[in-house]
From Swiss-Prot:
It comes from Hathewaya histolytica (Clostridium histolyticum). The keyword Iron does not apply. It is found in: Cytoplasm. Belongs to the TACO1 family. This is Probable transcriptional regulatory protein ORF2U.
Amino acid sequence: MSGHSKWHNIQAKKSKVDAKRGKIFTKIGKEIAIAAKNGGPNPDANPKLRDVIAKAKANNMPKDSIERAIKKAAGELAGVNYEEILYEGYGPDGIAVLVQALTDNKNRSAGNVRHAFSKHGGNLGSTGCVSFMFQTKGQIVIEKNDELDEEELMMMALECGAEDFQSEDEVYIITTSPEDFGSVRETLEEKGLEFLEAEVKSIPDTYTVIDENTAGKFQKMLDVLEDDEDVQDVYHNAEFPEGWEE
């Protein structure tokens, strides 16, 4: 059950953007606040909030920032209605792209996303044009270390409901169904494991290798999308060239 999921390839580009712009805590904080607003501030009674808090912890978001985000739900977000919207389209050279937005203004979001696509050699498509190329899965990423036995971790993950276990150079990747993600994550947490990533996301069925020229265009498109305050996540099926840097 080992394989190459391209996690480092994609995560390196995403982390680079998030670190450069300092946006990640703001985006996750928004998710926490809205999850608390919709389902209540108690994580024990709100599975969605539990999942987002796990995502926050995996990204090293401070505890006080998480608590402030929950309190926002009863304050400044009390009268604001946010919608989750999924945009689909193609990046340069036909890269399949999904953009997950959380917005209080659909017209603003649609305009910004459409502009990001068209300006960088892509085009925004209709619903369903690329989503069939992706599967929604829970993904838990754990950094390798000398104290972790790969065989034991794999058996533990599969026994508590994981669908797949992969080993990359520096990480283990545990994949679950969306429905089992919470229970698998909580079981592993109870065993004292810490995560580099823990969230439900869209994972492409296959990846498309792109050249350096396309990579440069596409990275600029990703920069613009991930800098948008309404955009929460961007998923794609591009595999950047080995060792490529912007």
